[in-house]
Amino acid sequence: MQLLVSPSSIDEARHSLAADIIDVKKPSEGSLGANYPWVIREVKAFSDKPVSAAIGDFDYKPGGAALTAYGAACAGADYIKIGLTFEGKEKARAVISAVVKAVKDEFPEKFVVIAAYSDHQRMGSISPFDMAPVAADEGADFVMVDTGIKDRQSTFAFMNEDTLRTFTRTNTKLGLKTALAGAFTFEDIDALKRINPEIIGVRGMVCGGDRNATVREDLIKTALAMIR
């Protein structure tokens, strides 16, 4: 299980180098808010760790999603991550297919991560269980669960441990890897280890409990020690 940490600035990224994966995003623009391409480039330049880039919480806009994904890949991101804020498997298929093609045609070595939301019912968006088979069909590498509305409620408030374990095992059978995120705390780590996704994504946990505070290197090291 790898630890992905989401700094919100270049300065924070410099304090996140202990993480397994550095995730460039802009929390002020949403759960998977996109940061600037020059931030991705600079983080990639000084880090020897894989870099992930969130490209946004997308409504049904396949063209916009494809172009944004391509931009993140060109800027140097190793993982390109998009959230789907709409309902419907066929609409999801169109967006996922476009994003995978935009990235993989030129950068087959890069990873495409498709996110749905644990709180999809209140978001009015596609369920993670409905999204995952579509992502597998269209050639994505990872599927992810995160909270869409950031009100300090955890993914565990919407999907319990058994549900997340089933999700992770189902993804493995589909040939997908799993990333889990969504207001996790240090107290959640034992459950996450039992679920055993490939990646857990955190921000608030390593900011002292407030995702709008600053990433702390000491808390990243604490989290790493706990998940190993």
Q: What is each model feature region?
A:
Residues 150-211, 217:
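Hydrophobic secondary-structure block in the mid-to-C-terminal portion of proteins
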Residues 10, 30-46:
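Glycine-rich, positively charged N-terminal anion/phosphate-binding segment
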Residues 39-43, 88-102, 202-228:
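C-terminal helical cap(s) of enzyme catalytic domains, especially alpha/beta-barrels
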Residues 40-43, 68, 99, 131, ...:
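Aromatic/hydrophobic pocket-lining residues that form π-stacking "cages" and hydrophobic walls in ligand
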Residues 20-33, 74-89, 142-152, 195-219:
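Glycine-rich phosphate-binding active-site loops on the catalytic face of alpha/beta enzymes
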Residues 50-52, 56-67, 75-156, 170-174:
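Conserved anion-binding
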Residues 8-18, 53-75, 122-134, 180, ...:
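Catalytic cores of alpha/beta
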Residues 1-3:
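Extreme N-terminal starter segment of soluble prokaryotic enzymes
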